[in-house]
Design a protein with these regions (language model features):
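Surface-exposed amphipathic alpha-helical tracts and adjacent flexible/coil segments at the periphery
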Residues: 1-221
Length: 221
């Protein structure tokens, strides 16, 4: 079976790396949750505040190759470019705008491409979206009924770029008094132990400090 995953990151933007790694992390965690006979090789827990979706990042299509058996077709020869995810069809062509038959929410700044009946690809960015009506930044020649793909989702990109993605390790903390001062032990989930002692004089606190100590030590992340 597979022991590692190679994620293409050369010359890719931060949003691509964030989205793709979060997607695979999510899928791996789903497998580990239902397979008690498997465990991950790394430690920690990844947290992200967006829903990863591979179709939102640069890709040249997807294939299962021979994973589920032999296939007649394994590649698309339509274009080497990233056409994005299908969202609908061109409903009406106006002088400065297009009406798209779609259930998706369209955003100012989105990028699209339209594939016509002759497999010609017309790509464009929009300045404005009002409902399902989009206003391209430049004039485009597309026909009614053409398949519309979105290859740049402005809102999704903003969400990924401003996300607080992090990886946290579970730590057990023990703080206790010694004859000469105090001692602090931290045990990471991978078994590593860090211990620090401090020699100092002691004075009785005017107020109980247990809750304050717990609060301060909980600020590790």
């Amino acid at each position: 079976g597979a022991s590692s995953l190679k994620i293409e990151g050369r010359l890719k933007e931060v949003d691509y790396v964030k989205n793709v790694t979060a997607f695979y992390r999510q899928k791996l965690d789903e497998i580990f949750a239902r397979r008690s006979d498997l465990q991950k090789a790394s430690f920690g827990r990844s947290e992200y505040d967006f829903i990863p979706k591979l179709e939102k990042s640069f890709n040249r299509g997807f294939t299962s190759y021979f994973f589920t058996g032999k296939r007649e077709k394994m590649a698309s020869f339509l274009t080497p470019k990233s056409i994005g995810e299908p969202i609908g069809k061109v409903l009406t062509v106006k002088e400065k705008s297009l009406l798209i038959d779609t259930q998706e929410v369209l955003n100012n700044g989105d990028g699209f491409c339209v594939i016509d009946n002759f497999d010609h690809i017309i790509g464009f960015r929009i300045n404005k979206a009002v409902g399902n009506e989009v206003f391209p930044a430049d004039r485009v020649k597309v026909g009614k009924g053409g398949m519309v793909y979105r290859n740049f989702d402005q809102n999704f990109n903003n969400a990924v770029n401003h996300s607080n993605t992090s990886r946290k390790l579970a730590v057990s903390i023990k703080f206790f008094e010694t004859e000469a001062g105090f001692n602090l032990n931290l045990i990471c989930e991978n078994g590593l132990l860090c211990s620090q002692s401090v020699v100092m004089s002691k004075e009785l606190a005017q107020k109980p400090q247990k809750e304050n100590i717990i609060k301060q030590l909980s600020r590790l992340g």
